Amino acid sequence: MFLAQEIIRKKRDGHALSDEEIRFFINGIRDNTISEGQIAALAMTIFFHDMTMPERVSLTMAMRDSGTVLDWKSLHLNGPIVDKHSTGGVGDVTSLMLGPMVAACGGYIPMISGRGLGHTGGTLDKLESIPGFDIFPDDNRFREIIKDVGVAIIGQTSSLAPADKRFYATRDITATVDSIPLITASILAKKLAEGLDALVMDVKVGSGAFMPTYELSEALAEAIVGVANGAGVRTTALLTDMNQVLASSAGNAVEVREAVQFLTGEYRNPRLFDVTMALCVEMLISGKLAKDDAEARAKLQAVLDNGKAAEVFGRMVAAQKGPTDFVENYAKYLPTAMLTKAVYADTEGFVSEMDTRALGMAVVAMGGGRRQASDTIDYSVGFTDMARLGDQVDGQRPLAVIHAKDENSWQEAAKAVKAAIKLADKAPESTPTVYRRISE
């Protein structure tokens, strides 16, 4: 038996906590026997004193074990359970292609996803732009879809890592969100509750990233790889670029449309293709579905070329109560905005810089995201045909096409786009899409 205040005191004085002390505290958060003040105090001591790697692993495992941990053994699946987690960005629609692509190659992806947060789009919000799409199937149905289709993308239920929800809510109001051990535990508790064999982390870098600097993004990626492997899940991370919108579109229905076009081969944005392929390669290698990069890429290209990946996406949509012919007739089902019109730069030039975060916030302002949890989303709004860094723009080539609910909203969005995109006389040097791979 421990006392919460003694655990706080020990950490306050700079000592490492034991696994038992951490589990006691986290179970108390779940059971409401630890007060909000005590959670805040421990969070602040961790913020200032950091945690050792064993402490980080213990914290993550305790938070994972505060609720249900999925177990897939009874399904006798003939492939690995793998998933991807992204720290979030703008136009980051990789999950919608990656899940079906890896499933078509023999993996099983029980993806528990989130809603939009701040300027970043949420995978669940995107999928809910598909009529009827059910993001909360019951446990048995979730398992059936994984067994039959190979991939399902669902929302987090209250039974998964419940301690994290309360811990995060307190961190949010006490300026302790940006602590690497706490971020690591929060992300991984939910992911490891999926019962994974392997995980790949997509840690964004740049103006639209969650972490403000390259160094902090790198530190987070290294922490996650260290902790997840310490918890027994094969994990690698990629540092990928978010200095511009990743896809050609940003929003909800517009990104789903781009995902379908990507899978069918109708249109593939080259940067989106690079990042999606790189993440899929990691999943195939970590999941032992491919021995090396070349074999993984060949398998992934094959399921894109032969239509298998698109077929898996269609089956997932149908299994989650969406239209059975969605891939073939997506244009018929996805909502369209009242006003669709291009915005042009005031001068000619080359796109040299993009405030990706501001573009994400512009989508939120148009109604494509939430300012508070109770807000409803307008799934039809957003941007398409986004100019990329290095593109030449003028009176013929727009900065973006804006999908808005009315003229007033379009004008506000146009102002935001012009302010967020800087032009120069010559094209900037191109930046990589993937900066670095981090493994144990």
From Swiss-Prot:
Pathway: Pyrimidine metabolism; dTMP biosynthesis via salvage pathway; dTMP from thymine: step 1/2. GO terms for molecular function: 1,4-alpha-oligoglucan phosphorylase activity; thymidine phosphorylase activity. It catalyses: thymidine + phosphate = 2-deoxy-alpha-D-ribose 1-phosphate + thymine. PROSITE patterns: THYMID_PHOSPHORYLASE. Its EC number is 2.4.2.4. Coiled coil: none annotated. InterPro entries: Glycosyl_Trfase_fam3, Glycosyl_Trfase_fam3_N_dom, Glycosyl_Trfase_fam3_N_dom_sf, Nuc_phospho_transferase, PYNP-like_C_sf, PYNP_C, Pyrmidine_PPas_bac/euk, Pyrmidine_PPase_CS. GO terms for biological process: pyrimidine nucleobase metabolic process; thymidine metabolic process. GO terms for cellular component: cytosol. The keyword RNA-binding does not apply. The keyword Transferase applies. Keywords: Glycosyltransferase, Transferase. Belongs to the thymidine/pyrimidine-nucleoside phosphorylase family. Homodimer. The enzymes which catalyze the reversible phosphorolysis of pyrimidine nucleosides are involved in the degradation of these compounds and in their utilization as carbon and energy sources, or in the rescue of pyrimidine bases for nucleotide synthesis. This is Thymidine phosphorylase. It comes from Escherichia coli O139:H28 (strain E24377A / ETEC). The lineage of its organism: Bacteria, Pseudomonadati, Pseudomonadota, Gammaproteobacteria, Enterobacterales. The gene is deoA.
